[in-house]
């Protein structure tokens, strides 16, 4: 029987603002739903749209656009200090309550989404059943250090061009943008040309970079925003649910970047996609979805016993 998607869109009131969300599948199916947290901060749900495929397994999938982005309320005049990890944690909890799933849910956070998901999971919410940090940093200083290492391995002149414009602050110079794209094509998304949903997200960031610039910076690898010193290392052992770490062989989230997840979380496993960079859900879509579904089916079963720290 062919799977027919049941799709519902709506808005969750978040104080004076609105959080747009979409549910693919049936929240009343009895199977643990998966909440997908997009990256950035400042991106949109579009580029992680592929995770809707998971709904065919019976796990409903919730996408949402974080405040300031996509179809949610935009606040371009807010001071950079407004945009905090705490704000986005509150928004996530508000969405879980709005959808009435706070007693039973799993989280998949991609890139920054995994950072936010880590902060959420560290607090040990009672309804969280599983956590999937996909291509996510654990320490921004390590992230930047690894990005600098990867930059130096790019074709001749690219790193020097990036460095020249970063020193001058000329981030909108066409030469800088072109050099940045070389890095992105190697370590962010290796599907060329970029799929429409990926291009749509980057276009949305360009149209309103408020959150991205405030918290991250002008590019993936030049982090000068409020997250520049963020880290979850030393705190990840508090995560007490089954965890699946996802990354790509060519990922800017290198093995060194994701290693603390593997070292600190008691019940953890790692899926490394050999033909992917930062977006295995796009670059190896079928294999990635299969891995996620297999994990959810295993650990969200009533028979599963969570591994504890020894």
From Swiss-Prot:
It comes from the Bacteria. The keyword Hydrolase applies. Completely inhibited by ZnSO(4), ZnCl(2), AgNO(3), CdCl(2) and HgCl(2). Partially inhibited by PbCl(2), NiCl(2) and CoCl(2). Unaffected by LiBr, H(2)BO(3), NaCl, MgSO(4), AlCl(3), KCl, CaCl(2), CrCl(3), MnCl(2), FeSO(4), Fe(NH(4))(2)(SO(4))(2), CuSO(4), RbCl, Na(2)MoO(4), (NH(4))(6)Mo(7)O(24), SnCl(2), CsCl and BaCl(2). Completely inhibited by phenylhydrazine, but not by the other carbonyl reagents hydroxylamine, hydrazine, D,L-penicillamine and D-cycloserine. Unaffected by the chelating agents o-phenanthroline, 8-hydroxyquinoline, enthylenediaminetetraacetic acid and alpha,alpha'-dipyridyl. The keyword Membrane does not apply. GO terms for biological process: proteolysis. One of its GO terms (molecular function) is peptidase activity. Pfam families: Abhydrolase_1. Residues 33-284 form the AB hydrolase-1 domain. Monomer. PANTHER family: HYDROLASE, PUTATIVE (AFU_ORTHOLOGUE AFUA_2G14860)-RELATED, MONOACYLGLYCEROL LIPASE. Belongs to the peptidase S33 family. This is L-amino acid amidase. The gene is laaA.
């Amino acid at each position: 029987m062919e799977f027919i998607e049941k799709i519902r869109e709506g808005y969750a009131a978040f104080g004076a603002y609105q959080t747009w969300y979409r549910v693919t599948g049936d929240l009343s199916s009895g199977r643990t739903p998966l909440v997908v947290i997009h990256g950035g901060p400042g991106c949109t749900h579009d580029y992680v749209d592929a995770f809707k495929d998971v709904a065919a397994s019976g796990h409903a999938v919730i996408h949402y656009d974080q405040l300031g982005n996509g179809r949610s309320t935009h606040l371009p005049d807010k001071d950079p200090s407004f945009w905090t990890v705490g704000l986005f944690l509150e928004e996530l909890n508000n969405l879980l309550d709005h959808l009435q799933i706070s007693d039973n849910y799993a989280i998949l956070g991609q890139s920054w989404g995994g950072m936010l998901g880590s902060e959420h999971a560290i607090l040990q919410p009672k309804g969280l059943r599983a956590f999937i940090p996909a291509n996510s940093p654990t320490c921004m200083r390590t992230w930047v250090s690894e990005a600098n290492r990867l930059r130096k391995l790019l074709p001749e002149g690219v790193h020097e061009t990036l460095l020249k414009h970063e020193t001058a602050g000329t981030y909108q110079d066409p030469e800088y943008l072109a050099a940045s794209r070389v890095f992105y094509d190697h370590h962010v998304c290796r599907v060329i040309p970029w799929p429409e949903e990926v291009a749509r997200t980057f276009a949305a960031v360009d149209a309103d970079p408020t959150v991205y610039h405030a918290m991250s910076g002008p590019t993936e690898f030049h982090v000068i925003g409020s997250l520049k010193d963020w880290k979850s290392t030393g705190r990840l052992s508090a995560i007490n649910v089954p965890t699946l770490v996802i990354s790509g062989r060519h990922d800017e989230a290198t093995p060194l970047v994701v290693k603390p997840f593997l070292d600190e979380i008691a019940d953890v496993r790692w899926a490394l996609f050999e033909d992917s960079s930062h977006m295995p859900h796009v670059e190896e879509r079928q294999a990635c979805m299969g891995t996620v579904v297999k994990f959810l089916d295993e650990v969200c079963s009533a028979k599963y016993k969570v591994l504890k720290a020894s």
